[in-house]
Amino acid sequence: MNNPLKINTKSKSYSLQDSALYKIKSKRRLLSLLNLSHQELKSLLSDGNYNIYQDNTQEKPRLIEHPQRQLERIHTRIASLLCRIKQPEYIHSGIKGKSHLTNARTHIGPAPTLTTDIKSFYQATHIHSVFDFFKNSLDCSPDVAKLLSELCTCNGHIPTGSRISMPLAYWANAHMFNELYRYSSERDIIMTVFVDDITFSGNKVTRTFKQNVKKIIEKHNHVMHPTKTVLHKENSLKVITGAVVGSKKLQIRNLHHESIYSELSQWMLIRDENSKNSSIFTEQIKNRLLGKINSQGQIDNRFKDKARSIKNYRKV
């Protein structure tokens, strides 16, 4: 049985110039870093190394491009190296101690807020942007940058279902994010990024600001999502990375309340049944319910008490 692969930063954090990926000038050094032979590298450069399928578990179906085992190992290795490079404070995704909730909390307050995301972010980050990152930002030789960009992309773009997707999408688009950050900071506007979700809050967040953000994004060959871009007025509630943000605190979304209480009612109806099948089903519902309640407990402490009572429940 294969051991599960995971990103390992070894608790390291350093500048881009101190990365093991910096200034790789020969194929031999690249092969050594990735622990690959010439033949293995050659076999991994085709798009046939991905399992491609449709994920229908969400409201909107998503095309998933997941690397097969050998390529997944290489992606995990490169992702581990990329995740050791320090990222700006405005990034809240893929960083220990940060989350969608720290991203949302940053914007608590009455100020006008702009929420948006980049349409089809991974698919719209093309191989030439990945090549530019390895060649210009990491100062690799052109042939090494070409190999790395081919290893890290599927059908000419960043894959949608790899461990490398999130960190590489940031670095390949760092110029765009940094330009947006500079533009915001000059106007005393707070900006945060969670993968492809970008949020701005401040007194100078206006329609003109929104239009200029749109221009910057388009300048870097991306599209501001037309239906997911909202300009929130002063003192209004806004949904930021899954949490409702008010003037003084985070709140739980109504749909999350409804989902929790629907499953809680279902669990309470069947929790005392004794058949084997019902016990398995009850445990599944209980675990799913606890997962949802624990998640919302990060926003509202009252849910932590509810989770404890469910976890400690014993049949009469």
Predicted feature residues:
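Right-hand nucleic-acid polymerase module
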Residues: 1-56, 61-162, 171-178, 182, ...
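Catalytic palm active-site di-aspartate
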Residues: 115-119, 161, 165, 186-202
